[in-house]
């Protein structure tokens, strides 16, 4: 037993395992399986591996329902990231991760290490990372602590992403009071690779070596997995020791060396895995489990940056910029030399065994000896679920916006943080560092050129959690649909999904119901779009003092554009172009931005979503884009038609003159399955013939500063310059206000 550690009997009697997240039943199960009391280190490694953050023991029964295979899928859930075939022996690799709890405690480091962790997932698969996107949720901007979190998170993402040289190309940011105590920091990374470079995280081959590479191990992030598997209490002291500290310059060295090793020594590399949640413990044990093997580690060999670290600390540390490689026996020196030439630690710390045991040695003592399969398969929990009481209380009556002064309503709407331009935040991110970004932040989706080809990859993150609060299943369907519309607006065809499932405590039957219904809704539309869910992340226990966030399943989506010369942008391009609305507008106000703005809350039954209308609208855009008939395309979402029109005008610095056969309120309706597009006069006839009765001509793009909108009840004039100023400066003004 290591000095100052509790004895097995003291572990049992003190019940420290409960503090670490194990239940009484789980501890008893461990005792039964081992036929003895687990020691301090063994109890610790079970607490890490059986945490919800690592094991998904509570969410896995639901996650198994995800549809995750079609002819493009080369790697689905279960590895570091998902992989899709994009033709020409190339593949796109992508995944999303969350760093919610750490970003609340230490906003800068929490967000920065979220970027670092997801990038390692990408390059551990053999792919060169090409882009990062962020899906962020914060409390209201009139809260001083929220401003502190926003500043720290934005700086952390920029500080890490810019330094490592991977462009941050897009994402979305929302603000709602429910996130004040639980901000959400979801990061999606995308990589590109040749298919023959694909790696997996496995430890097979008896006697093969386990090589530790990268940064030294410290005490940062210990218990990070357990920390992310519990809800907050505002009365509790923040656990800063559970937050990792990142070094992007070191990460760049690790990334480059890892990709070089794969290029030059793929014949001797058996497996690669990032040390993420639960650190060395999770990466090594999961690699053994995938191969049905055992592992023997000598912890004396683990590089340490702090003195006196215990086996418990060495195994559960979540120090950043570390990888595990499994290399063929006798071939280790080539890998060691490569990493050491980059001034990185590279040392053999163990071997693959055939006994199915996870065995740890420290100072000539066996400090852990447990079955790999048992360690890596936490007992699943099928939890009870019940429809939230609020849903039964919502009426089907749609909220009626107050249209007393339409012009003022528009200007006030543009100043709302969820609607207003995020340019003052995105400007901190380097979106052009690799010079392949064709559509930068601020458009519907980012577009990245694939070098030496005509192709491009479109990518986006989307979710409107207010919709899910009103109807989890329909809201989730709409999240997938909106992501797809954003991809389609660039001209690309959606090909796959990664998810970031952010929810409250699954121990609450109402929250578990929300999770179940959200997954069902995602599946519903994903199957129809032929976009398999190939990777993802679950972040539960997003609660503070019993107050849960809205159900927030972030949808990360990637699309493929076969010919980048057909790419379409959000901005109106030239005066005289015809403006069209694709799709029908209905009474869709419950859960809308105008409802929140005018009442301070959202309520009521969510408006309808029609799958067939959605697919038809998207197909119209794809068809006319393929014929090069569009000068611009923009999907409609928060804020409705008026916001979509103004965003296209602002992006192109052009005005417009439109007439709509609708009452004023419909300018703010958030009916899904709609786009605003612009078409050159010479293409008008062909466009209308192809699009059919799903489009309505609204008016024309103009070259002057005036925006003219005629409805059945009003004539509205706006100044492009003054309106754009409100849209662009509102968030910066709110952040800087005392």
Curated annotation (Swiss-Prot):
Known pathway: Purine metabolism; IMP biosynthesis via de novo pathway; 5-amino-1-(5-phospho-D-ribosyl)imidazole from N(2)-formyl-N(1)-(5-phospho-D-ribosyl)glycinamide: step 1/2
Compartmental location: Cytoplasm
**Keywords per UniProt:** ATP-binding, Cytoplasm, Ligase, Magnesium, Metal-binding, Nucleotide-binding, Purine biosynthesis
Disulphide bridges, residue numbers? none
Q: Where is the active site?
A: 53, 99
**Residue positions binding substrate:** 98-101, 120, 244, 318-320, 539
**GO biological process per UniProt:** 'de novo' IMP biosynthetic process
The yes or no answer to whether the keyword Ligase is present is yes
Q: Which GO terms describe its molecular function?
A: ATP binding; magnesium ion binding; phosphoribosylformylglycinamidine synthase activity
Binding residues for ATP, per the UniProt record?
Answer: 56, 95, 499, 536
- One term under GO cellular component: cytoplasm
UniProt-annotated binding residues for Mg(2+) 2: 121, 274
Q: Where does Mg(2+) 1 bind?
A: 97, 537
Q: Which reaction does it catalyse?
A: N(2)-formyl-N(1)-(5-phospho-beta-D-ribosyl)glycinamide + L-glutamine + ATP + H2O = 2-formamido-N(1)-(5-O-phospho-beta-D-ribosyl)acetamidine + L-glutamate + ADP + phosphate + H(+)
Into which EC class is this enzyme placed?
ligase
**Which InterPro entries does the annotation name?**
PRibForGlyAmidine_synth_PurL, PurL_linker, PurM-like_C_dom, PurM-like_C_sf, PurM-like_N, PurM-like_N_sf
Function in brief: Part of the phosphoribosylformylglycinamidine synthase complex involved in the purines biosynthetic pathway. Catalyzes the ATP-dependent conversion of formylglycinamide ribonucleotide (FGAR) and glutamine to yield formylglycinamidine ribonucleotide (FGAM) and glutamate. The FGAM synthase complex is composed of three subunits. PurQ produces an ammonia molecule by converting glutamine to glutamate. PurL transfers the ammonia molecule to FGAR to form FGAM in an ATP-dependent manner.
Under NCBIfam families, the record lists: FGAM_synth_II, PRK01213.1
Subunit note: Monomer. Part of the FGAM synthase complex composed of 1 PurL, 1 PurQ and 2 PurS subunits.
* UniProt protein name: Phosphoribosylformylglycinamidine synthase subunit PurL
Q: Which organism is it from?
A: Leuconostoc mesenteroides subsp. mesenteroides (strain ATCC 8293 / DSM 20343 / BCRC 11652 / CCM 1803 / JCM 6124 / NCDO 523 / NBRC 100496 / NCIMB 8023 / NCTC 12954 / NRRL B-1118 / 37Y)
């Amino acid at each position: 037993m290591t000095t100052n550690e509790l004895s097995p009997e003291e572990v049992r009697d003190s019940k420290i395992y409960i503090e670490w997240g194990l239940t009484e039943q789980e501890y008893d199960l461990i005792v039964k399986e081992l036929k003895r009391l687990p020691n301090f280190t063994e109890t610790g490694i079970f607490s890490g591996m059986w945490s919800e953050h690592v094991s998904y023991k509570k969410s896995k029964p639901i996650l198994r329902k995800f549809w995750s295979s079609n002819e493009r899928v080369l790697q689905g859930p279960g590895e570091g990231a998902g992989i899709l075939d994009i033709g020409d022996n190339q593949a796109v690799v992508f995944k999303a991760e969350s760093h919610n709890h750490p970003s609340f405690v230490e906003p800068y480091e929490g967000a920065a290490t979220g970027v670092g962790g997801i990038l390692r997932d990408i390059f551990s698969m053999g792919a060169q990372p090409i882009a990062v996107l962020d899906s962020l949720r914060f409390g209201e901007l009139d809260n001083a602590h929220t401003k502190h979190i926003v500043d720290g998170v934005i700086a952390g993402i920029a500080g890490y992403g810019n330094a490592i040289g991977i462009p941050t190309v897009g994402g979305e940011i929302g603000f709602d009071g429910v996130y004040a105590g639980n901000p959400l920091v979801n990061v999606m990374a995308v990589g590109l690779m040749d298919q023959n470079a694909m790696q997996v995280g496995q430890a097979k081959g008896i006697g093969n070596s386990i090589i530790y590479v990268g940064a030294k191990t410290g005490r940062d992030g210990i218990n990070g997995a357990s920390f992310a598997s519990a809800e907050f209490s505002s009365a509790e002291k923040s656990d800063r020791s559970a937050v990792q500290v990142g070094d992007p310059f070191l990460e760049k060295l690790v990334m480059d060396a890892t990709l070089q090793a794969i290029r030059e020594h793929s014949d001797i590399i058996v497996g690669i895995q990032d040390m993420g949640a639960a650190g060395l413990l999770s990466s090594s044990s999961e690699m053994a489990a995938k191969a049905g093997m055992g592992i023997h580690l000598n912890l004396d060999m683990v590089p340490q940056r702090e003195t006196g670290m215990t086996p418990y600390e060495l195994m559960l540390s979540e120090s950043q910029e570390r990888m595990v490689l499994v290399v063929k026996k006798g071939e280790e020196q080539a890998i060691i030399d490569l990493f050491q030439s980059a001034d990185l630690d590279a040392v053999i710390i163990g071997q693959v065994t055939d006994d199915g045991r996870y065995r740890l040695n420290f100072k000539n003592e066996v400090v852990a000896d447990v079955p790999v399969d048992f360690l890596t398969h936490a007992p699943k929990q099928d939890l009870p679920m019940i429809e939230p009481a609020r849903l039964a209380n919502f009426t089907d009556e749609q909220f009626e916006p107050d249209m007393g002064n339409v012009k003022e309503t528009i200007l006030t709407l543009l100043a709302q943080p969820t609607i207003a331009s995020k340019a003052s935040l995105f400007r901190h991110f380097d979106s052009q560092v690799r010079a392949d970004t064709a559509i930068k932040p601020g458009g519907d989706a980012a577009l990245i050129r694939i070098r030496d080809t005509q192709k491009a990859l479109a990518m986006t993150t989307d979710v409107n959690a207010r919709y899910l609060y009103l109807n989890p299943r329909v809201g989730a369907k709409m999240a997938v649909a909106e992501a797809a519309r954003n991809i389609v607006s660039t001209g690309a065809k959606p090909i796959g999904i990664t998810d970031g499932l952010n929810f409250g405590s699954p121990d609450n039957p109402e929250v578990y119901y929300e999770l179940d219904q959200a997954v069902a809704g995602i599946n519903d539309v994903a199957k129809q779009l032929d976009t398999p869910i190939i990777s993802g992340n679950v972040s539960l226990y997003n609660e503070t003092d019993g107050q849960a966030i809205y159900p927030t399943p972030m949808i990360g989506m990637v699309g493929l554009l076969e010919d980048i010369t057909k790419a379409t942008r959000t901005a109106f391009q030239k005066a005289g172009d015809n403006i069209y609305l694709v799709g029908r507008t209905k009474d869709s106000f419950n859960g809308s931005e105008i409802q929140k703005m005018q009442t301070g809350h959202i309520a009521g039954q969510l408006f309808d979503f029609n799958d067939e209308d959605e697919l038809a609208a998207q197909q119209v855009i794809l068809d006319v884009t393929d014929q090069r008939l569009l000068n611009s395309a923009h999907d409609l979402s928060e804020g409705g038609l008026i916001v979509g029109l103004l965003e296209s005008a602002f992006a192109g610095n052009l005005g417009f003159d439109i007439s709509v056969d609708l009452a004023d309120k419909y300018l703010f309706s958030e009916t899904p399955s709609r786009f605003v597009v612009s078409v050159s006069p010479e293409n008008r006839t062909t466009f209308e013939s192809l699009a059919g009765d799903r489009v309505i001509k609204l008016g024309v793009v103009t070259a002057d500063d005036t925006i003219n909108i005629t409805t059945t009840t009003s004539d509205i004039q706006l100044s492009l310059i003054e309106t754009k100023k409100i849209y662009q400066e509102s968030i910066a003004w709110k952040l800087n206000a005392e």
